[in-house]
């Protein structure tokens, strides 16, 4: 290197380590409509000021590294850096803070949840200066949303395809989840659909194991769908799980499902990955398939209150990546889910515009512009006695999915489906007549039992079943 070059390059550069907050903590910053905004729950190590911790998150998830480097001078850090623009103490929690970070839109590839998450929830989550870090919420700007296709079809198009209106849809996960032969599996699908369900579902564990290869399962399930449709006059579906070990194999399964003429396929979007999910969602839109999404592995990421990522962020990411249904908890069943938090991300899945509401854990106003909505699926430990509460909590635009609550009926699978359909129809009728489902729910179900022996038998079996455990992930005392 010539002396002239060396002198020019060294202007304004000082080697060494400097505090993150000198560059990345900018409390006077005015956020832009095009910024991606993030709310992080930060627990700094002892001795680390919250401003330095928040700035470190902004730096390590955008342009920063642990030391100053020569190549900082070859770009405009002010244009590309993330900025921690506000810090709030979490009431009732020692050494926890909410750090708000703004990211310039140019940091992210268009239409790529994978790239967005690689930056925002990447290596920064292992940063030693932080004891724990959790991403509570994201504000996705409309300019970025418009680079995504989103759900293959959305709520209204799905209802039109199925010709089903004015009530929640009913589903059932086939059990036992593993071990059935393809023929016996198809028989269970047929019995449930014939009994009155709209959908049946592959368990998320079911891919293509030695006891039941995927092609055999697809064929027997298609036969069950067509037979039940012919007998009931209703459009039916089974969530055929296309999740596989490679994207190529996944697409092969989706293509075969389309060739069979079935209405819907399924994907495990977290274990399968966002790149695979987005590819499948694009295929489903182009070929008229609905796409059901299971969230297997979500609790590894979202259940602990101080570290990881809240499910509302995963729900937003799914709406961008693409899916027509996604499992969203039940509030009343066996799986984690506080009511206000659950309703918050259910609205983020379905609605076009959601206002900031800290009482429901929503940190930012979110405008989805023209992106279609996603049906939330309530599934896990629910039965006929839960039907009034589920109908009242989730409303019409939802899927209520009873696995054991259908297949565990003492008279068999079809009577289990009948019991659920009768319970749902009774709740919808009562609601439409102006009755209070929250207060009168049990009485509504008891009255329906008088003209449905199948429902009466189901009510007797599950009359004592409760899952009364306090959720781990709860709102903070101030509504955070």
UniProtKB/Swiss-Prot annotation:
Keywords: Acetylation, Calvin cycle, Carbon dioxide fixation, Chloroplast, Disulfide bond, Lyase, Magnesium, Metal-binding, Methylation, Monooxygenase, Oxidoreductase, Photorespiration, Photosynthesis, Plastid. It comes from Ipomoea purpurea (Common morning glory). Its main location: plastid. PANTHER family: RIBULOSE BISPHOSPHATE CARBOXYLASE, RIBULOSE BISPHOSPHATE CARBOXYLASE LARGE CHAIN. This is Ribulose bisphosphate carboxylase large chain. Mg(2+) binds at residues 201, 203-204. It is an enzyme of class 4 (lyase). The modification N-acetylproline is found at residue 3. Belongs to the RuBisCO large chain family. Type I subfamily. The modification N6,N6,N6-trimethyllysine is found at residue 14. The keyword Plastid applies. GO terms for cellular component: chloroplast. One of its GO terms (molecular function) is magnesium ion binding. The active site is at residues 175, 294. The disulfide bond which can form in the large chain dimeric partners within the hexadecamer appears to be associated with oxidative stress and protein turnover. Its cofactor is Mg(2+). PROSITE patterns: RUBISCO_LARGE (PS00157). The record marks 334 as: Transition state stabilizer. Heterohexadecamer of 8 large chains and 8 small chains; disulfide-linked. The disulfide link is formed within the large subunit homodimers. GO terms for biological process: photorespiration; reductive pentose-phosphate cycle. The basic functional RuBisCO is composed of a large chain homodimer in a 'head-to-tail' conformation. In form I RuBisCO this homodimer is arranged in a barrel-like tetramer with the small subunits forming a tetrameric 'cap' on each end of the 'barrel'. The gene is rbcL. RuBisCO catalyzes two reactions: the carboxylation of D-ribulose 1,5-bisphosphate, the primary event in carbon dioxide fixation, as well as the oxidative fragmentation of the pentose substrate in the photorespiration process. Both reactions occur simultaneously and in competition at the same active site. It comes from the Eukaryota. It catalyses: 2 (2R)-3-phosphoglycerate + 2 H(+) = D-ribulose 1,5-bisphosphate + CO2 + H2O; D-ribulose 1,5-bisphosphate + O2 = 2-phosphoglycolate + (2R)-3-phosphoglycerate + 2 H(+).
